[in-house]
């Protein structure tokens, strides 16, 4: 009985804090026993919403809640599961959980429910990763991509790719068995064509995943400009609250400031950078270096200029940075447009600058940002949603490339070896059974109760 209890896990599945409803999840062989103990019900029907009182180990009433029992294997984890839907808040849910744990049930580790679902064959790793990412989705488009992956879109690609590699591998094994025979040209061409097609498909998926990665991670938008052009004021205006210190003293912002803000259907990472100029101040120089680093990995760059001041060498330096980043999405904005315009616009007119001030221009700016974000994220291509997935398909692609030369030279054992490595790599996307460390790391990033 003790082992039965310890093999059963429990956790609060909803966010900690004030809410209308909280959910406590219990999974394992003792789940039904615990449900009966704390509800005092003698009969609990599967998939039936029981409105019941819940009691602690001293028989004191905790709350009235909805209790649902999912009989194995027809549950998320494939095990016996009971879920308690109680009134929200920080006290009631915790007392119910404490009562469950007092009977010898173990507190679940982060991601342990999903890990059990994986080991019980209810989900594969692509679906598990999609569940984890969906919780943190940064846009509507991201949620759609992740929902498709939860339904098996990536798993289908993995299975199809694996089958194609296994067919080529089967050919090679037959050819090894009949090594004295010449390999027919049409079989050779068929294998090469199949492998080339798979490599091209993988490259397209990887390229699309890098290009659209901001859908999953959150697109990064960096504001750059010389000191005291109003970058921090722009950040505060876009956030709708004062996050950065605003001062007339040049160089007030000495480090990058990053915050999340919603633009249209996207949650972006908005970065206010230190003013870029020549400086002998050690601290300011570090801030400028970080500014340049933020620019390099940003999806969109807002280059801000002060319309109330004449164009100078520091503005020229900002434009030089912008000119060198033609592969980036650039928005040029002229700040303080409500003051007398002194900035010579000839140098920046080709960028179709947007005029902004403390009183106007932000609607046009946010609409342009939204349009760019939509264009970066658009596409129907399959996406890889984690570094682990990208690394696996790249290993498969490299192994396929390594296999082609031995095939052309008739070195079938080497061809077979590289193809087996490709099969292992592509299969590891959905089922890397050979590495407990990978599984622990991946499921450990899930939230508690998931």
UniProtKB/Swiss-Prot annotation:
Residues annotated for K(+) binding in this entry: 228, 247, 249, 252
Chain positions recorded as (6S)-5-formyl-5,6,7,8-tetrahydrofolate binding sites: 25, 83, 122, 450
Enzyme category, top tier: hydrolase
Pfam families hit by this protein: MMR_HSR1, MnmE_helical, TrmE_N
Keyword vocabulary terms for this entry: Cytoplasm, GTP-binding, Hydrolase, Magnesium, Metal-binding, Nucleotide-binding, Potassium, tRNA processing
Subcellular location per the Swiss-Prot or TrEMBL entry: Cytoplasm
Claim: rRNA-binding is one of the keywords in the record: no
Keyword GTP-binding (UniProt): yes
Entry GO MF terms: GTP binding; GTPase activity; metal ion binding
Main location: cytoplasm
Residues that bind Mg(2+): 232, 253
Cofactor or coenzyme needed: K(+)
TrmE-type G domain span: 218-377
UniProt binding sites for GTP: 228-233, 247-253, 272-275
Family stated for the protein in its record: Belongs to the TRAFAC class TrmE-Era-EngA-EngB-Septin-like GTPase superfamily. TrmE GTPase family.
The protein's role, per its UniProt record: Exhibits a very high intrinsic GTPase hydrolysis rate. Involved in the addition of a carboxymethylaminomethyl (cmnm) group at the wobble position (U34) of certain tRNAs, forming tRNA-cmnm(5)s(2)U34.
Binding partners and assembly: Homodimer. Heterotetramer of two MnmE and two MnmG subunits.
Name used for this protein in its record: tRNA modification GTPase MnmE
Organism: Sulfurovum sp. (strain NBC37-1)
């Amino acid at each position: 009985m003790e082992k039965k209890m310890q093999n059963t896990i429990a956790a609060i599945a909803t966010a900690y804090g004030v809410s209308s409803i909280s959910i406590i999840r219990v999974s394992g062989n003792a789940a039904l026993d615990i449900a009966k103990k704390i509800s005092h019900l003698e009969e609990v029907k599967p998939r039936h919403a029981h409105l019941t009182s819940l009691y602690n180990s001293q028989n004191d009433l905790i709350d009235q809640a909805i209790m649902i029992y999912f009989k194995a294997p027809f549950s998320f984890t494939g095990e016996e599961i009971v879920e308690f839907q109680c009134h929200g808040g920080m006290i009631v849910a915790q007392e119910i959980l404490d009562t469950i744990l007092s009977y010898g049930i173990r507190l679940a580790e982060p991601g342990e429910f999903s890990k059990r679902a994986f080991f019980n064959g209810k989900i594969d790793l692509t679906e598990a990763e999609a569940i984890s990412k969906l919780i943190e989705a940064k846009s509507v488009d991201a949620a759609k991509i992740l929902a498709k992956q939860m339904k098996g879109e990536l798993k289908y690609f993995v299975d199809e790719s694996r089958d194609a590699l296994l067919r080529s591998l089967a050919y090679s094994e037959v050819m090894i068995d009949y090594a004295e025979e010449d390999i027919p040209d049409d079989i050779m061409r068929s294998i090469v064509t199949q492998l080339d097609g798979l490599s091209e498909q993988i490259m397209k998926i990887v390229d699309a995943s890098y290009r659209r990665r901001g859908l999953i991670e959150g697109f990064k938008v960096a504001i750059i400009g010389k000191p005291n052009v109003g970058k921090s004021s722009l950040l505060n205006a876009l956030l709708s609250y004062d996050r950065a210190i605003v001062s007339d003293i040049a160089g007030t912002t000495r480090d990058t400031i990053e915050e999340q803000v919603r633009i249209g259907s996207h949650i972006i990472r908005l970065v206010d950078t230190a003013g870029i100029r020549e400086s002998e101040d050690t601290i300011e120089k570090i801030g400028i270096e970080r500014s340049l680093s933020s620019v390099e990995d940003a999806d969109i760059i807002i280059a801000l200029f002060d319309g109330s001041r004449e164009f100078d060498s520091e503005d020229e330096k900002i434009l030089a940075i912008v000119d060198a980043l033609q592969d980036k999405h650039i928005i040029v904005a002229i700040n303080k447009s409500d003051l007398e315009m002194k900035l010579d616009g000839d140098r920046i007119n080709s960028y179709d600058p947007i005029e902004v001030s403390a009183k106007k221009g932000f609607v046009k700016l946010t609409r342009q940002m939204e349009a760019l974000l939509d264009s970066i994220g658009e596409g129907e291509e399959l996406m890889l949603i984690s570094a682990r997935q990208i690394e696996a398909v790249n290993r498969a692609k490299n192994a396929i490339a390594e296999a082609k030369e031995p095939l052309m030279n008739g070195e079938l054992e080497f061809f077979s070896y590289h193809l087996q490595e490709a099969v292992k790599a592509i299969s590891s996307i959905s089922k890397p059974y050979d590495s407990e460390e990978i599984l622990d790391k991946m499921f450990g990033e899930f939230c508690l109760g998931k």
